């Protein structure tokens, strides 16, 4: 059974990551979350949107994982939201495109994106919360 994830964010990058996870991963995206102050709609990409402040009531940490979908323009915010999700106890998932070239010895953290046409060579260690895009 595929693992279920919630995407943190409601941006064009969030929509792109929803598409990528849906089409190219074994994860099932079940919804989105955003900080209460940014709640504008109850759905995004046809899925429910939940206030982050209430997220663990709807999507408990033992049943769901998370992906923080904040792009390049708000890298500081991405780090803050990553830390908030970790503080609530969520495991954060990576997205690795099936069209990327990844070596078997890759050591990788959490909440990373490796898009298509990216080539990660031998002896590489990647930390948390990075985006690799060509």
Enumerate the language-model features and the residues they cover.
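Phosphate-bearing ligand-interacting subdomains
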Residues: 38-101
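Hydrophobic, well-ordered beta-alpha structural blocks that scaffold small-molecule cofactor pockets
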Residues: 1-60
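Left-handed beta-helix
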Residues: 98, 103-104, 109-110, 114-116, ...
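Short alpha-helical
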Residues: 12, 76, 107
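Glycine-rich nucleotide phosphate-binding loop and flanking beta-alpha elements
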Residues: 14, 74, 120
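Short loop/turn motifs at secondary-structure junctions
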Residues: 1, 26-28, 62-63, 91, ...
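Hydrophobic alpha-helical segments typical of transmembrane helices
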Residues: 17, 81, 133-134
């Amino acid at each position: 059974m595929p693992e279920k994830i919630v995407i943190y964010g409601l941006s064009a990058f969030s929509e792109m990551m929803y598409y990528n996870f849906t089409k190219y991963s074994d994860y099932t995206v079940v919804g989105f979350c955003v900080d209460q102050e940014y709640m504008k709609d109850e759905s995004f990409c046809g899925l429910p949107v939940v206030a982050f402040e209430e997220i663990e009531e709807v999507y408990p940490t033992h049943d769901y994982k998370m992906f923080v979908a904040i792009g390049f323009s708000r890298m500081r915010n991405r780090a803050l939201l990553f830390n908030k999700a970790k503080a609530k106890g969520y495991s954060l998932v990576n997205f690795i495109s099936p069209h990327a070239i990844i070596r078997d010895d890759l050591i990788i953290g959490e909440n990373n994106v490796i898009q298509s046409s990216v080539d990660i060579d031998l002896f590489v260690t990647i930390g948390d919360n990075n985006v690799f895009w060509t």
